Design a protein with these regions (language model features):
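Non-transmembrane, aqueous-exposed alpha-helical and coiled segments at domain scale
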Residues: 2-63, 68-272
């Protein structure tokens, strides 16, 4: 077995090596616009960011059929539920099967997190998600069409993960069969998944009375508290209007009523 090298093979011929060239067709399909809070205590950023297939792979760690199927499912849901609007990662709750692949897609695209109670688990979903917009309580479900993914590959995926004493596959067999299974997965992706559109085999429906599982843990998420705070009307910050604009000057704004208020501390006299 090879070991990772100290030199990162970041790209090959200008492309990320970790996304095979034959997945090029998936790139334009699996693009997601998302929006987030502007800072840890900030309001909602009005500009969006684009999440690509490469981003999902970097977050998850590798390309696999589960990652791609989850991304196809989420693309189908977004097209129906949000109708061109971005995924607002400050305002979504997601339910996913307890799968590394599906769960990572869910977390990255919706902002759902187990520790805040906004990523919850339901293994009965299979390859699919339930997504709730918290502010409106509108809820949608997306599921993969039954039989779309080959049952033989599913059987082998489960068998190759069985490390119990009674496992049907020996360690010597695994050395070969893991590679066979990977080849079958990729062949299915290339021949079937990439030849389809997300809405072809991933069905989305609105849920009027969704049963959302209990959270694993539920702490307060602080970076979305001020998402609806209005933009300042008096204080002119050097970091407005664009955080990514020119490099601003450093130091306080002299003579500013609001700089003075800040310097007095939270419990100091208020303005006006």
């Amino acid at each position: 077995m090879g070991s990772p090298t100290t030199e990162s093979e970041k790209s090959r011929d200008g492309e990320a090596w970790y996304v095979p060239a034959w997945l090029e067709a998936a790139r334009p399909v699996l693009e997601f616009d998302v929006c987030d809070a502007r800072s840890a205590q900030g309001r909602l950023e009005t500009r969006t960011k684009r999440v690509t297939l490469d981003d999902l792979v970097l977050f998850h760690g590798h390309v696999c059929d589960g990652l791609l199927r989850g991304a196809y499912a989420m693309r189908a849901l977004g097209d129906v539920a949000f109708e061109g609007r971005p995924f607002d990662r400050t305002d979504l709750l997601v339910v996913s099967k307890n799968s590394p692949c599906l769960g990572d897609v869910a977390a990255y695209l919706t902002g759902g997190r187990g520790r805040f109670g906004t990523l919850r688990l339901n293994n009965d979903l299979g390859v699919g998600y339930v997504v709730r917009e918290l502010s409106s309580e509108r809820t949608w479900e997306v599921r993969e069409e039954a039989g779309f993914f080959p049952s033989l590959i599913s059987q082998w995926e489960a068998a190759l993960l069985d490390d119990s004493p009674n496992a049907h596959v020996t360690s010597n067999e695994k050395a070969e069969l893991v590679a066979v299974n990977e080849a079958r997965q990729w062949s299915w992706v290339r021949e079937v998944l990439l030849a389809s559109r997300p809405g072809d085999h991933y069905t989305v429906r609105s849920l009027e009375a969704a049963e959302i599982p209990e959270p694993l843990y539920e702490a307060r998420r602080t970076d979305v508290v001020n998402r609806h705070v209005r933009a300042p009307s008096e204080y002119v910050t050097p970091y407005e209007p664009l955080l990514g604009g020119t490099t601003p000057r450093l130091g306080r704004v002299e003579g500013s009523t609001w700089e003075d208020r800040y310097d007095r501390g939270p419990t100091g006299p208020r303005v006006g």
